[in-house]
Structures are given as C-alpha cells and as structure tokens.
From Swiss-Prot:
This is Ankyrin repeat domain-containing protein 13C-B. It is found in: Endoplasmic reticulum membrane. PROSITE patterns: ANK_REP_REGION, ANK_REPEAT. Residues 20-29 have a biased composition (Acidic residues). The lineage of its organism: Eukaryota, Metazoa, Chordata, Craniata, Vertebrata. Keywords: ANK repeat, Chaperone, Endoplasmic reticulum, Membrane, Repeat. Gene3D superfamilies: Ankyrin repeat-containing domain (1.25.40.20). Its main location: endoplasmic reticulum. One of its GO terms (cellular component) is cytoplasm. GO terms for biological process: protein retention in ER lumen. Residues 1-19 have a biased composition (Basic and acidic residues). InterPro entries: ANKRD13 (IPR021832), ANKRD13_C (IPR055285), Ankyrin_rpt (IPR002110), Ankyrin_rpt-contain_sf (IPR036770). Residues 1-34, 55-77 are annotated as: Disordered. ANK repeats lie at residues 83-114, 115-144, 148-177. The gene is ankrd13c-b.
Amino acid sequence: MTGEKIRSLHRDQKPSKDEDLLEPDEEATADGTFTRTSKLKSSKMFSNHKVIRSPSNPALLQNHHHHHQQQISPMTPGESKTDVYFPVHECVIKGDIRKLSSLIRSHNIGQKDNHGNTPLHLAVMLGNKECAHLLLAHNAPVKVKNAQGWSPLAEAISYGDRQMITALLRKLKQQSRESVEEKRPRLLKALKELGDFYLELHWDFQSWVPLLSRILPSDACKIYKQGINIRLDTTLIDFTDMKCQRGDLSFIFNGDAAPSESFVVLDNEQKVYQRIHHEESEMETEEEVDILMSSDIYSATLSTKSITFSRAQTGWLFREDKTERVGNFLADFYTVNGLILESRKRREHLTEEDILRNKAIMESLSKGGNLMEQTFEPVRRPSLTPPPPNTITWEEYISAENGKAPHLGRELVCKENKKTFKATIAMSQDFPLEIESLLNVLEVIAPFKHFNKLREFVQMKLPPGFPVKLDIPVFPTITATVTFQEFHYGEFEDAIFTIPDDYKEDPSRFPDL
C-alpha cells in the first residue's frame, strides 16, 4: 500500500466504494443514544461491539447460522423494483408466521428490501412479536441499518415494547461477541507475522460547539507490540460526546491467554487492575434498557459518495504541492473534499419531561459540569402504549418509491442535519508500517471508541503512503487530529505485557467495563 512513489500521478484520489464511515457512538446500545450516567453500561468505555463492516451488497448479508441459504438476486439496472421478490419481508408485513417458519431456513433473513429494511426491521416496526422472536431465534442481524440509518434496535426503542428492546439488545451483544471470536484467529495470525514495534500517536480533539471546545482533551498514546501481545498507555480513560475522564491507564492484550482472560486494564495511579468481561448481569441489562427508553435515538453517518483527495497547496505567488515533515516522516498533504456528516435524532418515544431533563443535563455538561456529579438515576420504564395498528398493505409498501417508504410504527419526531466535514490528511511514503498492519493493531484496541473511529476512517481508499496525520470525525460535534509522531522496531521486556506484582485486582475499578 506504500509502494508507489510517483506523487504527481496521484493528485486526486477517489475511493473505490461508497461507505458510511461514522457509526453512532459504538456503545452496547449501538444506536448512539445520548447516555447520561457513567455508572451504567450504556456509557461503556469498553464496548464489546466492534464495527462490523457490512458488505456493499446487502444481499450478501448472510444469516450467521445458515451458510447455504438461497440467494435472492439483487436488482439489475433497468429492472423494476417490484420485479424483485421478498417473500420473507412479505410474510412479516402480512403477519403470516406459519409461512415465515417454512421460509426461514431456505432464505437469507438478513436481506434488505428496496427501502433498506430487513425482515427484522419490519417485524419490530409493526410490533409483530411472534415474527420478531422467530427471526431472532434464527440469528437475524440486529446491527444492520436501513436506508434512513436506523437499526432494528432503534425501531424497537421507538415502538416502546420493553420486552422486545431487551431481546434485541441481548441478541446484539451475542452477535458482537461471536463476531469478535470469529475474527480472533485471523487477527492473532496477522499480529504474529508483524514485526515488534513501538508507536506513538497524539490525539487532539476539537469541536465546532464553542462551549464544548474548552473542555475537550488531548492525549498522547504509546503502543507496544511484541509477538501477539499489545500494550497501550493512555491518559484518556473515557471519552464520549458528553464527557471525558483522565488518568494514567494501561490496556494490555495477551494473545496467548483464553479469550475471557485476554484483556486487562491497569490503573497505574491506584495500582489496581481489572479484567474486561463481556457478560452482563440482568440488572445491568435492565438499566441499559431504561436509558435507551429515556434518551434520544441517534444515527450519524459520514457519507463518502463524492469524496476526493486533492494535493494541498502552499505559497503565495508560486503555488506548489505541500510537503512537510510530520514527526520524523516526510509527508504529502492532501485536502479531503466531499465528506458529508449526516445526523438524525428521534424522540417520538420521549415525554416532555424526558426532553427537558435531557436538555438540562446537556446544558450542564456544555458549561463544564461533570457527569459524575449528576444525581440522575434511571427510573424503570414501562412499555409505551403501542402506536395505532398498521393499515399499509404489502403491495403499497413494496411498490413505494425508493427512499419514500410508507412509515410503519409510531409517528416520527425526527430532526436531520447535514454538515460538510473539512479535513486534511498527510501521507508519508517513509513510514515503515503499512495501513493493513495498523488496522490489525487498531482492531485489538477497538474497545477504545475513538480508536475505532480511526480504524473506520483509514479503511477508506486513501492516497498512496501511510496517514501520519489526519482529521477524523469522532462524534457528530467533535473531530480529532491524529498524528503519528514516532515509530521504531524493537524488542521489549516481557514485564511490559504483564500485570505488576504489587497491583491488586479490583473488579469494580471501572464500573462501565
């Protein structure tokens, strides 16, 4: 990826595919709901959900347990959208549970229709519990989003059936764990083949919200990699779009250990450590559902449909391509054009009291208030009164124009916002590491949400070289400038990757772990 040296041939780079790079805050909630207490799981620093990049062709989304499902052909150019048959979707809208049972083993239940909905989306929107539970029993994907950027979990929160929200949340976590376990052998193999090295990078966070800018952090991260072990030293313990928490923290990944023992976090000030676990108690799940039901539903995507990279220029009279040193590395600077941040916020499931309380918390935080000081405790939320029964027929739904699907479920209360994201990226031909190697390392430390954003961004088709400095969107109102300042190969003491003898285990040190 770093091979080509002829810069003049690459003045303008265009990605090969359209990808939505910015997921909502990668919490256990998976839908970017604004979270409000550091004591609860929904504001986790370490989420057990990694970004699972969906194939660009929705028809390739396979049901996890059925590798030999019948493929339904996607539309071809010139073909009418009603010519493509979606029998599973039709069963769900018609509430035909018997026919759905007969089709479910032979059809791709993760397929999207021409509105981007999967059968699970439709079942949840319509409040069809029988169909939804049958689809979940066959591992229908929960994280997948429709054309408007909403997952089945988001639609379940809107509908307001507590039991359904809980079932989807549990299935989402199960699927995320399975995805991590599936990737593990490939990841360990890639790490083993990679040389041992030290990498230092700097994070500088900014916001276009004036009051927020002054409370945003910066962070110098040190990454050590040896064999299949990784250590990350950081001062930024937790960072969401609403708060940051500072400290002296080390995150250690031991590839030789059992999956449940692989991850440990050291608090170097308190001299305690905590293992990262993925299982949650019944109470934690219930608290998370309470927060989901009392918060905005949020979706944010970074659209790359029209993205281009053009060489940045320098000089007043005689303009020339900008090439400067970043740390120890000579780099070509590019301007990133055509990135659009699209965000949507829904609140049809909230009461006026919820909205006022959420607004007060956000105002307190924007003035520098500490989330830890908030006295908010979630109230156990009952199910909402269901919306009026659906009267839209299958024919009306499927024949509707793409992007204008008849609304199913509770009447929408939605705000949309589009913002052009201006960014610069510096690519170096001298950097010893390849992007693919960086992606493998970032995948290990993806539980840190801001690192996950970096991993998503560098998966784009970038100009030639290694991105030694780049601007990335981390949250809808927050961007980060990431600078790779130092890199060298070398060997390290084994002690770097082990828990010091004088550290004590404290399973409750990080309540959100």
